[in-house]
Amino acid sequence: MINNFDQQIQYIPQFQQMQHQMQQQQQQQMQQQQQQQQQQQPQQMQIQLSTHEERLELASQSSPFEEKVTLNGLQKNIKVVIKNSPFNVQLRLKKANEIDLNCVAFESTLLYDCDTNEEKEVDFVKVKPVEHKASPNETGELVNIELRIKVLTSQHEDMFFRVKIEGQDPISKEPIKGLYALTHSIKVISKPEQLKKKQPPKKRTWNDILLESVSKIQHQQHEQQKLIEKLLQQQAGLSGSTSTTNNNNTTTTTTTTSSNNITSSSAINLPSPPSSTSSSPSSSPSSSPTLVNSHLLTSTLNNTSSNNLNSSSNTLNNNNNNNNNNSNTSTSNNNNCNINNNNNNNNNNNNNNISGFEDSFKQMMNAYTQLDPRQRAEKVRRVFRNASSRDSETLSELLDLFITEGVGGQLGTAVAPLPNSPPRLSNSSTQIQNSNNNNNNNNNNNNNNNNNNNNSNNNNSTNNNNNNNNNNNNNSTIPNNPFMSSHSNNGDPYPFFSNNSFDNDSFNSFGGSSNSEFIPF
């Protein structure tokens, strides 16, 4: 027994040594494992040794819409998102190169947006109300997180939400202290059409309506006042120019008596456009009848200057030529008012009696007669083809009036007799008579001047004789107007239409003798 006990005592140190060796081996294995873990994940040790300071901040947050809401006297910008639609949030480190975000796992939590700093999580049963997908950049300083919220604001008593994003240890899933960030306030809706609905406009009060209408009326009155002032200024400028031109016209001498009588007598057969004596003379070129009158004046003055006149008559003719040139630039016979009041009234009455329609009609007839007979039909046909509907109606009405006034039946046949009517003088015949009376009055005035001035010198008598000769020459050299001479019968009530038949060959109205070429309206 003693021997066995001694043997056991001998084995005790060996057993202790074995235990010590086994412990050392276990410690070595533990150290090796720790070294391997440190080699594989060196950043994990740094994360565990981190402090409690906030390391993440919100860089940006996207949303389809935004709203401004005032809660408890504070105005907030609410990010409006659509349920189950993704929106992005970017987070970055406050201190660069502190942690590599590529080695961090992120977790998202949906919280209520409370006025207090209390973090109250949104309850759920199985499905989390928020999902996320993190995408760090290459440097590990910035991370882009895509979020989706699966609950509505209306389902939670119209409360707004906030999302908390927190960094965790990828192995132990423990949160890293200070590595988190909160998003802005979020409102979740079901459809985007909810935001596009227009709010019903407020009803306008009567005061607003009245104020708006009064402002419009005031603006219109202001614009009208501006227009009236502008028109008054233009009228004042025209009246000033008219007074100056009238003063220049009144300075003409009585030596232009014969030249003015020439223009008045020549204007009988070739009428000029009517104008009032108060109108200002225009600086534009005169019309065609006035140009014809000027040609007649130059021809008659050249004929009289070819006679054997003394030096005083030549001076008188030069003065008459200058005065006639001035009278051609005027629009009315203003110079006659400075010679004789009676002659001025008669001439103005004669000019005013000539209507614009008769002048235009005579010009049309004159232009038609000047056409080549072979081209008349084509010209008239072209005019009717190019005429508008309104022009065609006007021409049809004009043709009806011609037929009513006596141009009845087919063209080229005898015209039906006109109904009996009291004889009346036409405007052209009265104009000729008035012009002859004016010439007689001028001649009588010249004869009276010659009788009263018997004691004058030979130059004055020569001038008076030249004036009488000029009047006689002008009366003899005035060409006969075919529209006046052929219808000068004072007893005919319709001087432009006679009872005699007319032939298409001589008066080729529409360019042919057959009725088939007549162009209907």
Curated annotation (Swiss-Prot):
Query: Which intervals of the chain are annotated as region Disordered?
Result: 238-357, 413-491
InterPro entries for the chain: CudA-like
- Would you say which domain of life the source belongs to? Eukaryota
GO molecular function, a single term: sequence-specific DNA binding
Q: Name one GO cellular component term.
A: nucleus
Q: Where do Low complexity bias regions lie? A: 238-266, 275-353, 423-482
Question: What name is this protein filed under?
Answer: Uncharacterized protein DDB_G0286447
Q: Which organism is it from?
A: Dictyostelium discoideum (Social amoeba)
